[in-house]
């Protein structure tokens, strides 16, 4: 998977800011990625969120739900381990 620079900007209808961390892998037909978003402007200003994204093999974000196959879990877990703030927010989700 091509490395994407972080931090980098994102913009959504309800706010914009920076992608602070990203954990992604090459998944064959797509490249799943989890992104830590930090809102700097808009109605979500000051909040953080996790975006579950799917990229095409060409590196473009796809407009569809992210599906992660269980065979991808170990590789994605290793990438999440390199993103401590994202990992902490995910931990809050599941614990």
Which ranges hold each PLM region?
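Intrinsically disordered, low-complexity sequence elements enriched in Ser/Thr/Gly/Pro
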Residues: 2-6, 49, 75
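Mixed-charge, Lys/Arg-enriched low-complexity segments
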Residues: 56-95
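Negatively charged, low-complexity tracts enriched in Asp/Glu with abundant Ser/Thr
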Residues: 1-31
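A short, structured beta-strand/loop element
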Residues: 30-66
